[in-house]
């Protein structure tokens, strides 16, 4: 969201980004747009979503605005109602197929609630964008909404000076269900370099328990949430990146994770799940080793082969930096600004 808000602010729009304040929240840095965090007593579950959406509704209700953008389904209800009350333009920024995430689709009662919200609201968000064409096609199929594709890709820096690579494997991003930690962490028993995990999420405690059960506390290192500059440096130092998802949930199958491009811009080859969007990009640019099987054995084999094949690693790393010249935020920003220009002038 920082990239989108910065681009809009630099184009002359007055932008306010609203989120939640948590005990583990990193302090806000000065940005060219306004930032607001809402405090909630509850931190998870139904009580949290009810409280956050209520607080968000009343906050938005008393703000002046010409348009409102809901970021994923968990903030769409207050955005929908406020836009109706104020009679303003509403936009949907869908990072994923929310209802098809494993933590949603495997819980029938929770799934029914979120699907009801989706059916009630999304058809009214006729303007929007998402991260890839398959997800855009799903929204058009389900609700007749024709959303643009804007990928959350890193800014291209032609003058960046990358630090020397260190032989460690990096996972960065949400530590959530269905990211294959159950097989990735045990795989490290058979890989002679450390795994560094940067981020937090609903699977963090389970991931730490898996690490302890496998006796890998010295090899699997949890860094938690890092400041953007710290995470960028950590990524640039990494030798191999990880982009894995469990098969089954359609949200995973149609995903396009931000970290895929973060690794790419840092010249870091990655082990990546062989799903359609990643396959299409890799067929064109060859920046990753794709795996069909996310078992511990398969992950360990892919990691060791890339660790031991210096020529292949160098080829993939070089391809990453070459691909970054065309796969970058400067190109995506043009599409974003065109959408907002059409809506607001």
List the predicted regions and their residue ranges.
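Conserved donor-binding/catalytic core segment of Leloir-type glycosyltransferases
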Residues: 129, 161-196, 317, 336
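Conserved acidic donor-binding segment of nucleotide-sugar-dependent glycosyltransferases
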Residues: 284-296, 305-310
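A short, well-ordered alpha-helix in the C-terminal region of glycosyltransferases
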Residues: 298, 305, 312-326, 338
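Nucleotide-sugar donor phosphate/pyrophosphate-binding loop at the beta->alpha transition
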Residues: 47-54, 89, 98-120, 156, ...
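Membrane-proximal helix-turn-helix segments that form the acceptor-binding/catalytic region
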Residues: 6, 54-62, 77, 81-85, ...
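Acidic donor-binding loop of glycosyltransferase active sites
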Residues: 235-253, 268
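Donor nucleotide-sugar binding/catalytic pocket of nucleotide-sugar-dependent glycosyltransferases
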Residues: 16-19, 115-160, 220-223
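Nucleotide-activated donor-binding/catalytic signature segment of Leloir-type glycosyltransferases, i.e.
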Residues: 208-233, 240
């Amino acid at each position: 969201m920082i990239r989108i808000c910065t681009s809009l602010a630099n184009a002359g729009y007055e932008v306010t980004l609203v989120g939640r304040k948590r005990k583990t929240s990193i302090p806000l840095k000065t940005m060219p747009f306004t930032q607001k965090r809402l405090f909630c007593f509850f931190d998870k579950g139904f009580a949290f979503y009810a409280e956050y959406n209520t607080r968000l509704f009343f906050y938005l209700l008393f703000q002046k605005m010409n348009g409102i953008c809901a970021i994923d389904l968990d903030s769409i209800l207050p955005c929908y109602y406020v836009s109706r009350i104020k009679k303003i333009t509403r936009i949907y920024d869908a990072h994923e197929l929310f209802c098809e995430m494993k933590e949603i689709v495997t819980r029938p009662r929770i799934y029914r609630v979120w699907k009801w919200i989706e059916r009630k609201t999304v058809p009214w968000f006729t303007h929007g964008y998402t991260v890839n064409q398959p997800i855009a096609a799903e929204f058009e199929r389900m609700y007749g909404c024709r959303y643009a594709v804007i990928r959350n890709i890193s800014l291209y820096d032609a003058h960046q000076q990358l630090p020397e690579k260190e032989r460690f494997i990096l996972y960065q991003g949400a530590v959530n269900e269905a990211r294959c930690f159950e097989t990735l962490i045990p795989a490290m028993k058979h890989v002679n370099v450390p795994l560094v995990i940067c981020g937090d999420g609903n699977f963090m405690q389970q991931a730490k328990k898996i690490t302890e059960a496998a006796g890998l506390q010295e090899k699997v290192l949890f860094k938690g949430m890092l400041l953007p500059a710290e995470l960028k440096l950590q990524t640039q130092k990494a030798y191999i990146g990880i982009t894995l998802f469990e098969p089954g949930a359609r949200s995973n199958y149609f995903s396009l994770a931000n970290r895929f491009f973060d690794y790419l811009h840092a010249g870091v080859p990655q082990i990546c799940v062989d799903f359609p969007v990643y396959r299409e990009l890799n067929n064109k640019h060859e920046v990753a080793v794709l795996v069909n099987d996310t078992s511990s054995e398969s992950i360990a084999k892919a990691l060791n082969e890339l660790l031991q094949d210096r020529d292949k690693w160098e080829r993939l790393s070089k391809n990453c930096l070459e691909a970054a010249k065309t796969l970058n935020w400067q190109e995506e920003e043009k599409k974003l600004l065109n959408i907002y220009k059409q809506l607001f002038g």
